[in-house]
Amino acid sequence: MPGEGEVVGDASDRRVEILCDRDELVVTWTRFGPRRDGASPHIHRAHSDLFFVLGGELTFFVGPEAEKRVLPVGTLAFAPPQLVHGFRNAGDGELRYLNFHAPSAGFADYLRGRNRDFDQWEPPADGGLPMTEAIVAPPGTGGILIDRDEIRIEVRGQDEPRQPSARLTCLYALEDARVLEIQA
């Protein structure tokens, strides 16, 4: 939950909290003020990058042509390794989102200013993976949003039974009485 993580950036137009920092997974909660830039188009070579929109709208740029998609509350966006992606808050309101890096690739230390060798690179000359490799689960999608080797994310009711797993599991309570369950 916001306010319970390690704060690594706190300004009037941006706040970032690390909620989970493990080798398998880093989860951050972020707030951007209106018209705030995030990351310009880039790739990761060794890990996946995911966004779950909690409030406002996230403008997501994806694929070799950096096609723009506006993601409303409740949307999950997934960028596998080698897929060009970037993001910003292009709107007039506040943006809040969860960001997942699986495996972590040292993302938390990068946010702390201690990992200059973080797995983030300029888009490759060949454009990287086609944008069809991105996964965007629209708002209102329930159940399993993504299930890949490196990460599994499910939305379920707070009272629904959880399946035991040997994987690292993080839970995030959503405002609508549902739970986001993340396994890495």
Identify the role of each PLM range.
Residues 1-26, 34, 40, 109-159:
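A short, N-terminal "cap"/entry segment at the start of jelly-roll beta-barrel domains
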Residues 31, 88-141, 172-184:
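Double-stranded beta-helix
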Residues 60, 97, 153-155, 181:
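Short hydrophobic/aromatic-rich beta-strand segments that constitute the beta-sheet cores
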Residues 65-81, 160-171, 176, 180, ...:
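Short acidic-glycine-tyrosine-enriched beta hairpin
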Residues 83-86:
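Short, charged beta-turn/beta-strand-edge "cap" motif at the junction between a beta-strand
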